[in-house]
């Protein structure tokens, strides 16, 4: 299990804590993550063996820099899609373009954007805090365009470990890295800089937890078992999560309660409530979807009808539209991908798995193309890179008068 420090995350932490406490391999179980977890893991799992892998390169604070003065191979970090787009537009005009990384992108689109950056087609990466996990790139400098983020409740300053997770993307293996700020973020105070440069962060003393030994006798018993108190002081019961809120909403429907008349159907109700809200539009819309899915699974042949899924999927196959439209379609397709991968919800699950995968791939490719078209000026990028390398530019004039510089069209000669 990677990124085990996410046990302390308020939203997802209980999932990681459950794996820490209960997931075990046949021969070995390995948890990877920050050293801040060491004391509490030792307390929870006294027999655990710890192996440390120190960072080989140095991380140094480089202060504030204007966007136009950021070095090549920089990642610029903001915390909203609006800010990411605005920064990417500026970099496109000034430096020829940038790759874009956000949590809303599908893995296929994200990998294509990373490949664009890694290949040197662009020298800048604009990202949300999604850059902090699961991506290894040749980044020399990380610039924070903001030091605050919206966490679903309100705006707050980034915690030291959050800053460290992102700043640590700079440098790789034995190559040193730098971090700093840009735009209106302002400087990082000296105390915080010292923590980040020396990788000194407070230990995690409490982990988020939820009971996973659930009771399925009745829906009410299930809800009560979800709210069971934590067994230790260093485990903190999570506040309402999406799935438990969905359960409460569906339990308010008398027909749903009547259908959940046995432990098997209560378990099925809980499985439906666990469908993630990938689209994150309105909670009511997601709850209506869950309600409909459970009604299908609890009546008739107990399967989700193929024609119903087909109607929904047919609205998502279009690859036109702007960046947000394409990203929205991908998020909706993920819901159907999740449903199609449940073992006994569909008559022809394999068919729908292939269909949803094909649609997501097509939308992901279209989204990558849209991001590249909007945020990469290939002509400017090629010329800027050639000038930075201080080499002579290769220019040519074609037979019909087109002027090409480094293979890029720059104009046409007339009358010569």
Give the label of every model feature segment.
Residues 249, 257-416:
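Extended, charged helical/alpha-beta scaffold domains that provide interaction surfaces
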Residues 25-39, 119-124, 137-201:
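Conserved segment of the helicase C-terminal RecA-like domain
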Residues 66, 107-125:
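Conserved motor-coupling elements within RecA-like helicase/translocase cores
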Residues 1, 117-136:
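Conserved two-lobed SF2 helicase motor
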Residues 4-61, 171:
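Post-DEXD/H (motif II) to motif III coupling segment of the RecA-like Helicase ATP-binding lobe
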Residues 29-32, 38, 69-94, 98-102, ...:
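Conserved strand-helix element at the start of the C-terminal RecA-like helicase core
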Residues 58, 79-82, 100-112, 128-133:
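Conserved helicase motor
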Residues 60-77, 161-251:
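C-terminal helicase lobe
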């Amino acid at each position: 299990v990677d990124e085990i420090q996410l046990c302390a995350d308020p939203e997802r932490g209980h999932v990681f804590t459950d794996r820490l406490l209960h997931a075990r391999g046949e021969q070995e179980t390995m948890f990877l993550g920050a050293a801040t977890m060491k004391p509490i893991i030792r307390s929870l799992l006294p027999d655990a063996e710890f192996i440390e892998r120190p960072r080989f390169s140095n991380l140094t604070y480089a202060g504030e820099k204007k966007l136009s003065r950021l070095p090549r191979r920089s990642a610029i970090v903001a915390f909203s899609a609006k800010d990411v787009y605005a920064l990417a537009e500026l970099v496109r005009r000034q430096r020829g373009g940038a790759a874009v990384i956000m949590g809303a992108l599908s893995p296929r689109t994200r990998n294509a954007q990373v490949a664009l950056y890694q290949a040197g087609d662009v020298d800048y990466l604009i990202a949300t805090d999604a850059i902090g996990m699961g991506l290894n790139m040749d980044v020399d400098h990380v610039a924070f365009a903001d030091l605050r983020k919206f966490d679903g409740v309100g705006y707050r300053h980034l915690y030291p470990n959050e800053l460290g997770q992102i700043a640590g993307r700079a440098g790789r293996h034995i190559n040193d890295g730098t971090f700093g700020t840009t735009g209106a973020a302002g400087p990082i105070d000296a105390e915080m800089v010292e923590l980040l440069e020396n990788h000194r962060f407070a230990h995690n003393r409490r982990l988020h937890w939820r009971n996973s030994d659930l009771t399925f006798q009745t829906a009410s018993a299930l809800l009560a078992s979800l709210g069971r108190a934590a067994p230790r002081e260093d485990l903190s019961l999570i506040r309402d999560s999406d799935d438990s809120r969905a359960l409460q909403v569906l339990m308010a429907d008398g027909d749903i309660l009547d259908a959940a008349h046995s432990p098997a159907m209560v378990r099925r109700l809980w499985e439906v409530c666990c469908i993630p809200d990938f689209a994150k539009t309105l909670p009511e819309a997601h709850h209506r979807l869950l309600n409909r899915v459970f009604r299908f699974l609890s009546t008739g042949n107990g399967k989700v009808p193929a024609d119903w899924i087909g109607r929904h999927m047919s609205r998502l196959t279009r690859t036109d539209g702007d960046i947000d439209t394409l990203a929205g379609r991908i998020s909706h397709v993920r819901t159907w991908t999740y449903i199609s991968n449940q073992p006994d919800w569909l008559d022809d699950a394999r068919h729908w798995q292939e269909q949803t995968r094909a649609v997501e791939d097509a939308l992901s490719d279209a989204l990558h193309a849209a991001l590249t078209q909007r945020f990469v000026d290939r002509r400017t990028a090629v010329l800027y890179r050639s000038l930075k390398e201080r080499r002579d530019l290769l220019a040519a004039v074609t037979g019909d008068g087109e002027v090409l510089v480094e293979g890029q069209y720059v104009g046409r000669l007339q009358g010569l």
